[in-house]
């Protein structure tokens, strides 16, 4: 009987741990999404050009400047997939945002910051778009191009 109770307790603890880990990964995805959004904003506003990058690597070293101009320190892995397999959100062939490629259902469904209000009630992490500006209208079929 004691062994059965211990087994049930361990099962509950494992479930709670898995949920806590997913919540941590969601927070990390939000942080990384904001980093990319901020980098896209910096690239867009740099030198008054109003352009977006052609590649994510251009956020690491902006080719429009003779010396190193960095808008992003490094290319992050997607914390949900564990890989740098971001789907790019494109307009006119230029990167205006990123999104995860994960089809998993997010735990977080509401109570987002104002800049992330569009993430509410999305059925998949892949539906969480991190664009600059945050409320940029995008054409869905353009969001399927991968890096």
Where do the protein language model's features map onto the residues?
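Membrane-proximal amphipathic alpha-helices
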Residues: 22-33, 49
């Amino acid at each position: 009987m004691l062994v059965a109770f211990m087994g049930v307790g361990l099962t509950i603890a494992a479930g709670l741990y898995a949920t806590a880990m997913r919540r941590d990964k969601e927070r990390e995805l939000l942080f990384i999404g904001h980093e990319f959004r901020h980098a896209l904003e910096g690239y867009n506003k740099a030198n008054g050009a109003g352009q977006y990058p052609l590649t994510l690597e251009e956020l690491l070293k902006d080719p429009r400047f003779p010396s190193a101009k960095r808008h992003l320190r490094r290319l992050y892995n997607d914390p949900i997939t564990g890989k740098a397999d971001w789907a790019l959100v494109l307009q006119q062939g230029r990167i205006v945002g990123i999104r995860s490629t994960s089809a998993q259902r997010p735990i977080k469904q509401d109570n987002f910051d104002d800049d992330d209000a569009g993430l509410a009630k999305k059925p998949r992490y892949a539906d969480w778009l991190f664009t600059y500006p945050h409320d940029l209208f995008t054409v869905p079929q353009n969001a399927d191009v991968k890096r």
